[in-house]
């Protein structure tokens, strides 16, 4: 079972652990940084469409903006009561005690807290590959060893392989559902069975950042496992459906003792973000509008990819992963699009022939479509007939 370590001990040990990182770990960290989106010199690159970070361009909602304006007078105070108010609001809606809810500066901080709680002193973590790298990146900086399990032939989590790789030494197992960058989901019944079994040996962290976009009947949240007291953590965010990526507010669910352990490593959330999140959480109309506009943009993107005969994976999120063609290179495609003022997703190893593009406003999608037609016609990528993953 995972060891216990306080935040103070963690900070004291971090320097020593970091100094002892192996070359392999450092190389893996460098690989992730090199493939990530780095700041651009926007004086040299005139950005016309931001389709690289899976953002929701329609937020924050009007109610969230008004709440932030009203909260300016509290900017001189540390957050306290605002944290509790939002935690209680979320707990009431989800049907669990407030001590089973934790807030963070985006769901990325929930993942970082989990890495710091379960990864130090040579801890082993397990994740699919490729998937969202936030947990792996945080874990490697403190010297944890991360096992990567490749996706299956349908670009989905290989749960059987992940189960086999979860030994007693593995302290934390990470599942991103829907998965980033592929947009695929693990059906609820299969994931629930996996979580119940694997959580007997390890903590299972299910990242549900794109939960609000999914309308597939076979999908379901794993929050019921947190309610029932399993060794399961659920993370969600206000960055996606709520359109608040720049405000950095996320939240999670777990058994109360797990939440208490995570809280040792939590930083504060700013009062404006808390005010906006509290208002947006109670604004189903805006959430529905975001969902509708995302579906429209995604449908438009599918039509463009069909027209140009690109193969893509049907997505359950606000981005689409598509195949550029045999021997095409995602980095070359990124460069070609950037020259046209369009930002697309980073390269995801080992799928170097694939590109991820986020949905945006309809104007942004049309700008992307025009550029994609141009890039394709110039032979910078090899267009291939669309084919869905095997069932």
Regions from the PLM with identified roles:
Residues 231-313:
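PLP-dependent aminotransferase class I/II
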Residues 336-340, 348-391:
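PLP-dependent enzyme catalytic core of the Aspartate aminotransferase-like
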Residues 17-77:
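N-terminal "arm"/small-domain region of PLP-dependent enzymes with the aminotransferase-like
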Residues 151-153, 295, 307-340:
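Conserved PLP-binding catalytic core of the aspartate aminotransferase-like
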Residues 75, 85-124, 142:
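Phosphate-binding glycine-rich loop
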């Amino acid at each position: 079972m995972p060891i216990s370590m306080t935040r103070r001990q963690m900070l004291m040990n971090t320097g020593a652990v970091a100094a002892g990182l192996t070359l392999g770990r450092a190389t893996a960290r460098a690989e992730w940084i090199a493939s990530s989106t780095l700041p651009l010199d926007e004086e040299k690159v005139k950005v016309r469409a931001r389709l690289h970070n899976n953002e929701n361009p329609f937020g924050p909602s009007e109610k969230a903006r008004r709440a932030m304006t009203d909260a300016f007078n509290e900017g001189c105070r540390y957050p306290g009561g605002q944290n509790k108010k939002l935690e209680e609001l979320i707990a009431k809606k989800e049907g669990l005690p407030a001590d089973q809810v934790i807030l963070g500066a985006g769901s990325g901080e929930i993942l970082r807290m989990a890495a710091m709680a379960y990864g130090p002193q040579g801890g082993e973590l397990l994740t699919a590959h490729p998937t969202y790298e936030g947990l792996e990146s945080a874990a490697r900086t403190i010297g944890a060893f991360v096992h990567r399990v490749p996706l299956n032939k349908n670009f989905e989590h290989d749960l059987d392989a992940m189960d086999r790789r979860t030994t007693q030494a593995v302290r934390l197992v990470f599942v991103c559902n829907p998965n980033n960058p592929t947009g695929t989901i693990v059906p609820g019944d299969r994931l629930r069975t996996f979580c119940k079994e694997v959580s007997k040996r390890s903590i299972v962290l299910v990242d549900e950042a794109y939960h609000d976009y999914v309308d597939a009947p076979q999908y379901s949240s794993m929050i019921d496992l947190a309610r029932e007291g399993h060794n399961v953590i659920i993370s969600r965010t206000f960055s996606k459906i709520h359109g608040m990526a720049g405000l950095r507010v996320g939240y999670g669910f777990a058994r109360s003792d797990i939440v208490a352990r995570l809280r040792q490593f939590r930083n504060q959330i700013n009062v404006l973000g808390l005010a906006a999140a509290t208002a947006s959480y109670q604004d189903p109309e805006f959430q529905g509008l975001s969902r509708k506009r995302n579906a429209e943009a995604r449908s438009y993107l599918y039509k463009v990819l069909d027209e140009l005969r690109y193969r893509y994976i049907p997505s359950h999120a606000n981005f689409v992963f598509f195949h550029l063609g045999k021997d095409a290179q995602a980095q070359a495609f990124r460069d070609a699009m950037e020259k046209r003022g369009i930002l697309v997703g980073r390269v995801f190893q080992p799928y170097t022939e694939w590109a991820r593009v986020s949905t945006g406003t309809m104007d942004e999608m049309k700008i992307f479509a025009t550029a994609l037609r141009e890039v394709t016609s110039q032979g910078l990528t090899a267009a291939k007939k669309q084919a869905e993953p095997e069932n």
